[in-house]
Amino acid sequence: MPILSRKDLERISRRVLFRYLTLSDRKMDRIDPIDFAEKICGLHFAFADMSVTGSILGLTSYSDVDLTISVPRGNGSVQEFHLNGNIAYVDQNLANAGSVGRLNFTLVHEAAHQILGMLYPEEYNPSAQPFICRLADERSTYPITDWVEWQTNVLTAYLLLPRELIDRYMDELGLGRQIKLLNKVFAPKEYALFSEMARRLGVSKTALSIRLDNLGMIGRNDFSNPYAPIHIYADDFDTA
């Protein structure tokens, strides 16, 4: 499979988004995942119970694969997922829980798998990996052990959060070119505006914080640990 850099994936996203804009006849306030997936790769979605633990959020296959996956259930029944490259199954708990951001990320993530499969049909060999599962995590771990998922996550962020929309909402919300401190405890006003930005874009705050960080649009990012500025560590004398 190809090892694509962030710059490679950004170039792909620009081409795909340009194509999407030419197929749409409306002003873009956010990327509509369902419309995007249908227009770009003819992908449709169905909601189902993906796993008992909720650890799997999505399931799809490449375009030239036709298969059925059988998943045993705790009550002795078996649930079947029919995959043909035109459908992606998404865990229905995402919709039931009202988690719009995670739902939208998962929908575009499944479309991103299809896009990479179409661009690199030999490398993304469907006979070697006939189907793809999306796990319940928007963050990429390092060192990277699964390049397929890392590349798909990065491409998803570029597609769902294009620079133009980010710049637009940063300006509209008065955040300027950079959020100096992203911290819900010590910078509540900026954090509230950041949260509103995530709502308008239809993404989770986690996904938005990662994207802004990668763009250099956050000075100090305390999203994951708002009490980081006041952590006090006792020295050996104090603990004696």
Question: What are these model-derived regions, one by one?
Answer:
Residues 1-240:
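Active-site hotspot residues in diverse enzymes, especially metal/ion-binding acidic/histidine motifs
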